[in-house]
Amino acid sequence: MTQAEIKLCSLLLQEHFGEIVEKIGVHLIRTGSQPLRVIAHDTGTSLDQVKKALCVLVQHNLVSYQVHKRGVVEYEAQCSRVLRMLRYPRYIYTTKTLYSDTGELIVEELLLNGKLTMSAVVKKVADRLTETMEDGKTMDYAEVSNTFVRLADTHFVQRCPSVPTTENSDPGPPPPAPTLVINEKDMYLVPKLSLIGKGKRRRSSDEDAAGEPKAKRPKYTTDNKEPIPDDGIYWQANLDRFHQHFRDQAIVSAVANRMDQTSSEIVRTMLRMSEITTSSSAPFTQPLSSNEIFRSLPVGYNISKQVLDQYLTLLADDPLEFVGKSGDSGGGMYVINLHKALASLATATLESVVQERFGSRCARIFRLVLQKKHIEQKQVEDFAMIPAKEAKDMLYKMLSENFMSLQEIPKTPDHAPSRTFYLYTVNILSAARMLLHRCYKSIANLIERRQFETKENKRLLEKSQRVEAIIASMQATGAEEAQLQEIEEMITAPERQQLETLKRNVNKLDASEIQVDETIFLLESYIECTMKRQ
């Protein structure tokens, strides 16, 4: 765990949960697993506050616990899960594009609350959607339930581990902490609920839009004496499935940039066909026949079977080897080499960074060293057609920034410089780790800058919010245009200009955070898949 990662975790925890939770979370990240009383003693926080902070962290899967032999429960921070909070806006936006506003709000509620039952999610989302609708219109629970089922079917949401029923019925003393288990086949099984009702607006707390008293409208079809059918069945967002989707999108974009739109659509179809059957850590997708791919192409995509076969052959023969041929049955069996695709994307990211930092000539040398694996300085000058002095400077720049490494191969045991080969090489894994570390630093700097900008203009922001609230309440009571204009003039022209500048700066910083996180995702995925292969 590097200092840059710890600092970023600290900023994220403070921004999402406040100072006390941040203090406990960072302490656990620094020290490793610890029991409750040791955490309270070391952080100088009251036992009650530590318990509440740990409750929040466990609820959001940021801390896990384990019961040791002597019955001591130790808590351990999940740093990688804390860093995933950076990606929350991306998870929510992805769901919006795939499942519209309803899907977006379902995932948003699960991310905001950590874990929720399906019935609670459906009710919250229906209420929120009803708030945004015109008067007289409401969102039906059944419609939200259908979207939830679709999210579960495509594995974007999953059940949380729960306490097994045998443990509850045990007559002996309860364990210090429950052991949570999940059955693989039940992970995406949606409970059969008959949710009847519609979303409510906040202002109509006594009666709903239809005028029926709130107490008389049944929430569920089950008798009130019976427990809610999904009581104890909690759901969470499946972040690994989102990461699989992001990876697939990156591969499709890379194929589109390298070849054309038709090739990318074929690859997208192959990925879509195997997205549920292929695990997120698998090196290859499931083999698919040419005939299956042809039948699964999007409706209205008019290409013949012969043209499809030609495209598949081109993709299989491409030097990047994103697509590989695994057999000849069914018109040819094809797979997507996910590990090679991630390696190519990580290499392209490194090349892009070298070009931006050091210029096109350095990028040329970098690509040459990548291609040749090991190369001497004299050979770099000859192959890259760059003068000796410039080539030496550029190689030293990249060497000092850890984009390259130097390997010594002595001719004699004494390692005399005159009798030693000095070969430049690129270790993609170590370069990716170095760049990932810098990305964490960049994100932390962006968050700090955004917080500074907001703090500097705190008074002005509060004034703007007050004015907006007054205008909204006056509009609701049917105030005249002149009155509204008078309230708006409470913010002067220079203040309005300052607000616009602040908004523009914060939007730029937010966009930069998301862009840097895209690079982080590619590098993390590449490092993870490489480590698994080793």
Swiss-Prot record:
- Renumbered to this chain, the Basic and acidic residues biased-composition regions fall at 211-228
Effect on the protein upon substituting K389E: Strongly decreased ssDNA-binding. No effect on interaction with POLR3F, POLR3G, nor with POLR3GL
Q: Name one GO biological process term.
A: positive regulation of innate immune response
Metal-binding as UniProt keyword: no
Q: List the GO molecular function terms.
A: DNA-directed RNA polymerase activity; single-stranded DNA binding
Q: Where in the cell is it found?
A: Nucleus
What keywords are annotated for this sequence in UniProt?
Answer: Antiviral defense, DNA-binding, DNA-directed RNA polymerase, Immunity, Innate immunity, Nucleus, Phosphoprotein, Transcription
Q: Name one Pfam family in it.
A: RPC3_helical
Q: Does the keyword Transferase apply?
A: no
Disordered: annotated segments: 161-181, 197-228
Q: Which residues carry this modification: Phosphoserine?
A: S194
User: Which GO cellular component terms are attached?
Assistant: cytosol; nucleoplasm; RNA polymerase III complex
**Domain of life here?**
Eukaryota
Extract the coiled-coil ranges from the record.
none
What Gene3D superfamilies is this protein classified in?
A: 6.10.140.1450, Winged helix-like DNA-binding domain superfamily/Winged helix DNA-binding domain (1.10.10.10)
Q: Which InterPro entries does this UniProt record tie to the protein?
A: POLR3C_WHD (IPR055207), RNA_pol_III_RPC82-rel_HTH (IPR013197), RNA_pol_III_Rpc82_C (IPR008806), RPC3 (IPR039748), WH-like_DNA-bd_sf (IPR036388)
Further comment found in the protein's record: Antibodies against POLR3C have been found in the sera of patients with systemic sclerosis (SSc).
Q: What does this protein do?
A: DNA-dependent RNA polymerase catalyzes the transcription of DNA into RNA using the four ribonucleoside triphosphates as substrates. Specific peripheric component of RNA polymerase III (Pol III) which synthesizes small non-coding RNAs including 5S rRNA, snRNAs, tRNAs and miRNAs from at least 500 distinct genomic loci. Part of POLR3C/RPC3-POLR3F/RPC6-POLR3G/RPC7 heterotrimer, coordinates the dynamics of Pol III stalk and clamp modules during the transition from apo to elongation state. Pol III plays a key role in sensing and limiting infection by intracellular bacteria and DNA viruses.
Subunit relationships: Component of the RNA polymerase III complex consisting of 17 subunits: a ten-subunit horseshoe-shaped catalytic core composed of POLR3A/RPC1, POLR3B/RPC2, POLR1C/RPAC1, POLR1D/RPAC2, POLR3K/RPC10, POLR2E/RPABC1, POLR2F/RPABC2, POLR2H/RPABC3, POLR2K/RPABC4 and POLR2L/RPABC5; a mobile stalk composed of two subunits POLR3H/RPC8 and CRCP/RPC9, protruding from the core and functioning primarily in transcription initiation; and additional subunits homologous to general transcription factors of the RNA polymerase II machinery, POLR3C/RPC3-POLR3F/RPC6-POLR3G/RPC7 heterotrimer required for transcription initiation and POLR3D/RPC4-POLR3E/RPC5 heterodimer involved in both transcription initiation and termination.
Report the sequence similarity comment from the record: Belongs to the eukaryotic RPC3/POLR3C RNA polymerase subunit family.
What protein name does the entry list? Answer: DNA-directed RNA polymerase III subunit RPC3
